[in-house]
C-alpha cells in the first residue's frame, strides 16, 4: 500500500502532516483517477485499470478524510472541491509529476474541472464523469437527507464496501461529511442557476471529455445541456444505460472505456 506524506493540505487544514494512500498500476503517461464523494471502494476503477494499465501509469489517491489516508473530523469546508484540487497538485508534486490526465468521477469530476481552471499547465486533458454543475440539486435532496441521517438504511453490500474502504467506525462519518457539505452549499444559494464554478466553467481550455450516464439520477433537468452551452469546445458523450457510475456498472463500463480510449487517442 504505497503512501506519501504532505506537509500540509488545505483539504485538512487543521492537521499536519497528511498521509495520502494511493494505488498505482502500469507504466506510461500519468493517468490520475479521482474518486467521488463517498470514496473509492463503492465505485472502483477495476475495469479501467485492466483496460489502460498497459499504456498509462495509473494513480488513484484517497483524498484526506477518505479510505486509508489521514482521517478528518468535523464539517467539510464549503470550498472543499477547490481545496481537494490543491491537495492533488501537492500529490503530483510529491511524485515529481508535471502533467497528468485526470479522470474524475462525481465529486472527483468537480475537482478535476477546478484543476483545469486553476492549474491547466498540470492537466494533459480531463475526463469528467457524472459531472456536477449546479450547487443546488433538488432531485437528489431526499436521497442525501435520508442517508446522511440514517446511513444504516443503505443496503448490506453497500455498507460492506464502505466499511472495507473507510473502516467500520468511520464510513458513516465519511457519508455524513459529504452529504451535509452539499446541503450547506445548496442552502446558501440565492438563485437556482448558481454553479460550483462561479460562472467560470467556460474558461477551461484543457481538452475535456464529459462522460455521462444517460440515466444518471443525480443530474438535474437541463443541467448537461447548460454544460454543453458553456463548454461548446468540449466533447460530450452519453453512455447508454449508464447511471451515476458508468465506469463501474456492468452494463456500461465497456462503452465507457471505449469512449474514453477514443478521446485519449485523439489527444496523444
Language model: regions and residue ranges:
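Conserved HGGG/HGGXW glycine-rich cap/lid loop of the alpha/beta-hydrolase fold
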Residues: 14-71
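Active-site loop/oxyanion-hole signature of alpha/beta-hydrolase fold enzymes
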Residues: 46, 60-103
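Flexible "cap/lid" loop of the alpha/beta hydrolase fold
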Residues: 110-118, 123-155
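Active-site nucleophile elbow and catalytic-triad environment of alpha/beta-hydrolase enzymes
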Residues: 180-200
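Short alpha-helix in the alpha/beta-hydrolase fold that links the catalytic acid
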Residues: 197, 206, 220-229
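Short beta-strand/loop motif that positions the catalytic acidic residue
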Residues: 204, 210-212
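Acidic catalytic loop of the alpha/beta-hydrolase fold
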Residues: 215-219
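Catalytic histidine-centered segment of alpha/beta-hydrolase-like enzymes
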Residues: 242-257
